[in-house]
Structure formats: structure tokens, C-alpha cells
């Protein structure tokens, strides 16, 4: 029987890859950890946010609980990415993060269909939601989850 490695899913490693993919689509733009969390969530459940893509992570009735877990994963992943030099930090307006040159080089090596689709959706999600405040993103997410009964 083949044994799967479930530690790859919902892990710092997986979240780190998604953060780098997300940050790579908008060049040197800096985002807060909360913005990264919400944009990643929107990216994975894009259909629920009326973006013209299917949900990358399928249907999930526990999205609100997943969002809470995703926040802590985002912070752990950011720490790991910063220490490895894969993302840069700016502290002028609170802690904000952008992909580094090393991170861009790493992302260019990711050629899977998932990586390509994630980046396509990320560009659309960023265009639609990047100017929203953290509170506004939370309000939109809460509304969408309650509207969908999830």
C-alpha cells in the first residue's frame, strides 16, 4: 500500500509556496501578513468570490475554521521565507512583505499546472481586492461564507 505524506498539506512548506506564488504576480508590491492570508484564501476559493475560476481547493464546508488555521500558517511561513531570503520585509508602515529576487528565481522553477493556475487566479484576485483594508476583506469573507452557508 502506498503511504502518502499528509504533512505536505496544510503545512508551512505548502503555505510558503503559495505565498511566493502570490507575491510573484505583482512584482515588488509589499503586503501585510493579513492581506497575504486573505488574498491566498480568496485565491484558493475564487469561485466563492465571484472570480471566473473554479475553486483550487474544491468545496469545503469548514472554510471559516480553515481561515483561522491559515492565519497562523501564514505567520510561520513568512518567518521561514524571510530567514531564507525568499521574501523581503519593509517596516515603515508596519510589517509588510514582498518577494525577493531569490524568491522570484525560485518561483520561476515551479512549472506545475497548479502553480500556473494559482498565479493566474492570484493576478485576478489582487486586481479585485488589493486595495481593500484588512477589515473590509474580513467583512467580505464573512459575508460570502454566511451567504453560501459555509
Regions picked out by a protein language model, each given a short descriptive name:
Residues 2-59, 63:
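Short, amphipathic alpha-helical interface elements at domain boundaries
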Residues 89-113:
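Accessory beta->alpha helical hairpin/"wing" motif in late/C-terminal subdomains of nucleic-acid enzymes
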Residues 104-144:
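Short, amphipathic alpha-helical interaction segments positioned at domain boundaries
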Residues 46-50, 85-88, 110:
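Amphipathic alpha-helical interaction segments
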Residues 75-84:
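Basic amphipathic alpha-helical segments that dock to polyanions
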Amino acid at each position: 500500500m502506498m503511504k502518502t505524506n499528509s504533512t505536505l498539506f496544510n503545512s508551512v512548506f505548502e503555505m510558503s509556496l503559495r505565498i511566493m506564488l502570490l507575491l510573484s504576480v505583482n512584482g515588488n508590491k509589499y503586503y501585510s501578513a493579513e492581506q497575504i492570508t486573505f488574498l491566498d484564501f480568496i485565491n484558493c476559493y475564487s469561485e466563492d468570490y465571484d472570480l471566473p475560476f473554479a475553486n483550487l481547493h474544491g468545496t469545503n464546508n469548514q472554510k471559516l475554521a480553515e481561515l483561522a488555521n491559515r492565519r497562523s500558517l501564514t505567520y510561520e511561513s513568512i518567518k521561514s521565507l524571510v530567514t531564507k531570503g525568499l521574501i523581503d520585509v519593509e517596516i515603515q508602515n508596519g510589517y509588510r512583505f514582498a518577494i525577493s529576487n531569490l524568491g522570484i528565481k525560485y518561483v520561476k522553477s515551479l512549472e506545475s499546472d497548479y502553480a500556473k493556475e494559482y498565479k493566474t487566479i492570484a493576478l485576478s484576485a489582487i486586481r479585485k481586492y488589493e486595495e481593500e483594508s484588512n477589515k473590509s476583506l474580513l467583512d467580505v469573507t464573512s459575508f460570502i461564507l454566511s451567504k453560501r452557508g459555509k
